[in-house]
């Protein structure tokens, strides 16, 4: 009997491993996928752009931050159409680069940069930063979940602004399944050190998976080192963990916050964040 149980256990472990390898493909190095119209290019780590253009519109910058839940809900496209209207920058997490999503990008004349953290059944998955204009530079960062071994991702981009400054943008999906905050803090620290080299305005946003007080403290401590302040929402329906703590955040510096709200939506398991800034005079 014990021999049969042992055999069954080994079989389940092998079957699980094989299934994982079939479903998920994890690149050895962080990869970035850029789509401009129907043209798609891929590179390791970073992508440079020869003709970056001004991101803001007449000194205003309207941003959508949203974990889109791999577009698993039937109404994701209708909701994304509505939330992305009049936005210059979309910072999405858990985006799956399916054919349907690629077509949405083409139809909206968007320029996108995605971290291909892993592929699930052939479709790239990871954070994606989307704008009407090309950035100056975009770089991919990944950090593996210590238990699941699937990477979480972050994208660091730099955009030209109309006041002559350069905006640094970090789009993050933070590590989730850990005991303690060591891996969580390490992921944030790498990005915080990159931002230390940037002298201009910064936007740091995404799904921080800040479901515990320890994580919340680690997050705020890391971002305070870059002199960032947190956006407060006048309409705050941000998705919360069972602890009552919000998972999604927006931090910034060198910009003037105009308004911020987090409306409810059934198009994902996270509610979207809609934030508007104005540029500072130079």
UniProtKB/Swiss-Prot annotation:
One function term, GO molecular function aspect: catalytic activity
Family according to the record: Belongs to the UPF0294 family.
Name this polypeptide is given: UPF0294 protein VIBHAR_03217
Subcellular location: Cytoplasm
UniProt KW Protein transport keyword: no
Membrane-spanning parts: none
Organism field: Vibrio campbellii (strain ATCC BAA-1116)
Cited Gene3D superfamilies: Endonuclease/exonuclease/phosphatase (3.60.10.10)
HAMAP family assigned to the protein according to its UniProt record, in alphabetical order: UPF0294 (MF_01119)
């Amino acid at each position: 009997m014990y021999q049969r149980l042992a055999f069954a256990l080994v079989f389940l472990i092998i079957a699980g491993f094989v299934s994982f390898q079939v479903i998920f493909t994890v690149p050895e190095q962080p990869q970035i996928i850029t789509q401009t119209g129907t043209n798609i290019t891929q590179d390791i780590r970073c992508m440079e752009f020869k003709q970056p253009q001004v991101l803001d519109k007449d000194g205003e910058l309207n941003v959508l931050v949203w974990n889109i839940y791999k577009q698993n809900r039937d109404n994701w496209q209708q909701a994304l159409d509505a939330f992305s209207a009049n936005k210059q920058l979309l910072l999405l997490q858990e985006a799956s680069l399916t054919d349907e999503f690629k077509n949405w990008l083409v139809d909206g004349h968007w320029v996108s940069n995605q971290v291909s953290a892993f592929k699930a059944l052939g479709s790239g998955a990871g954070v994606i930063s989307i704008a009407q204009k090309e950035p100056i530079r975009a770089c991919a960062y990944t950090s593996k979940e210590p238990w699941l071994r699937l990477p979480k991702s972050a994208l660091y981009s730099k955009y030209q602004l109309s006041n002559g400054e350069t905006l640094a943008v970090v789009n993050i999906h933070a590590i989730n399944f850990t005991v303690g905050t060591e891996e969580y803090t390490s992921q944030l620290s790498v990005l915080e050190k990159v931002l230390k080299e940037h002298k201009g305005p910064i936007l740091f946003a995404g799904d921080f998976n800040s479901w515990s007080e320890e994580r919340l403290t680690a997050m705020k401590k890391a971002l305070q080192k870059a002199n960032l302040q947190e956006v407060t929402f006048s309409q705050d329906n941000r998705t919360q963990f069972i602890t009552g703590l919000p998972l999604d955040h927006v931090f910034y510096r060198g910009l003037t916050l105009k308004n911020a709200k987090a409306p409810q939506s059934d198009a994902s398991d996270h509610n979207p964040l809609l934030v508007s800034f104005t540029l500072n005079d130079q």
